[in-house]
Amino acid sequence: MAASIPSDLRNLRACLLCSLIKSVDAFQTDGCENCDEVLHLKGDEEKVYDCTSANYDGMIAAMSNDDSWVCKWQKMQRRVKGIYAISVSGSLPSNVVSDLKSMGVRYKANQRDYSIQAKK
């Protein structure tokens, strides 16, 4: 399985859980191919805006995740093929974090937000 590759660089957002980059429409239509089991973005515009961010840095085209040193460096080996952000600013809403915790999904706020880590 692979995520749809964005054809337009405007109005893109990155998933706050896995950093997959897609358009708002693609998140609404297909959800997040990595996270929709737990985030349930498909068909929910409000949740798409809550669980994604338009503020991200850099892009990685991950096409061969198991063989790529970049995917290993970014801990993306088990993700679908697609375009990923190197760094994503923002964090999931507290109610979503609580839901993730109850499902046994580990989430560390700002884990992939390197702008915050650089300020420390």
From Swiss-Prot:
Q: Does the keyword tRNA-binding apply?
A: no
Organism annotation: Caenorhabditis briggsae
> A GO term (biological process) for this protein?
transcription elongation-coupled chromatin remodeling
Name any one Pfam family assigned in the record: Spt4
Family per UniProt?
Belongs to the SPT4 family.
InterPro entries, per the entry: RPABC4/Spt4 (IPR029040), Spt4 (IPR009287), Spt4/RpoE2_Znf (IPR022800), Spt4_sf (IPR038510)
UniProt lineage: Eukaryota, Metazoa, Ecdysozoa, Nematoda, Chromadorea
C4-type zinc finger locations on the chain: 15-35
Report a single Gene Ontology molecular function: zinc ion binding
**Gene3D superfamilies linked:** 3.30.40.210
Protein purpose? May function as a component of the DRB sensitivity-inducing factor complex (DSIF complex), which regulates transcription elongation by RNA polymerase II. DSIF may enhance transcriptional pausing at sites proximal to the promoter, which may in turn facilitate the assembly of an elongation competent RNA polymerase II complex.
* Source organism superkingdom: Eukaryota
- Where is this protein localized, as stated in its record? Nucleus
State the residue spans of region: Interaction with spt-5: 1-39
User: Which keywords fit this entry according to its UniProt record?
Assistant: Activator, Metal-binding, Nucleus, Repressor, Transcription, Transcription regulation, Zinc, Zinc-finger
Task: Relate the assembly described in the record.
Answer: Interacts with spt-5 to form DSIF. DSIF interacts with RNA polymerase II and with the positive transcription elongation factor b complex (P-TEFb complex), which is composed of cdk-9 and cyclin-T.
- Entry GO terms, CC: DSIF complex
Tell me the protein's name.
Transcription elongation factor SPT4
This protein's encoding gene: spt-4
